């Protein structure tokens, strides 16, 4: 699905690891909100340390042991703060894109012995429903020329 990015607002975001700037966007195609959480000058020709991170309420807010999403997000923000420059693209794609309620349904199936992929298939979803086209639009909006992508 192609995105239609709409910029909403920018604000400071003080965190435990440093002060970031948060940019809020909405994808008008699906009404989902996404964030670019950056630090430092992103407009240079040097690659910008970047992470694409999908929202995970169960891991990030409730410290679920089913995933390492909280660690990945914290580590990414820490690395950016240590470098003094970078951005996390935080996407509203809970549960590999199936949404929070369906993620809980998948957890129930996992409790019964299914793995994540099998559970998603049982619920009628592909193994991963996420899309990343919005990130390209966010990169362009922020004027970033090249990225140095952090992975799991």
Q: What is each stretch, according to the model?
A:
Residues 1-152:
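Catalytic domains of riboflavin
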């Amino acid at each position: 699905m192609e995105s239609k990015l709409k910029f909403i607002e920018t604000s400071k975001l003080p965190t435990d690891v440093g002060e970031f700037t948060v940019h809020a966007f909405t994808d008008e195609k699906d009404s989902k909100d996404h964030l670019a959480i950056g630090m430092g000058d992103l407009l240079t020709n040097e690659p910008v340390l970047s992470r694409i991170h999908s929202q995970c309420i169960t891991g990030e807010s409730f410290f679920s042991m089913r995933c390492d999403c909280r660690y990945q997000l914290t580590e990414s923000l820490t690395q950016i703060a240590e470098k003094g420059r970078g951005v996390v693209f935080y996407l509203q794609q809970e549960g590999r894109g199936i949404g929070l309620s369906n993620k809980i349904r998948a957890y129930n199936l996992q409790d019964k012995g299914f793995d994540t992929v099998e559970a998603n298939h049982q619920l009628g979803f592909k193994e991963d429903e996420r899309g990343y086209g919005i990130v390209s639009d966010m990169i362009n909006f922020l004027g970033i020329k090249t990225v140095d992508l952090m992975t799991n």
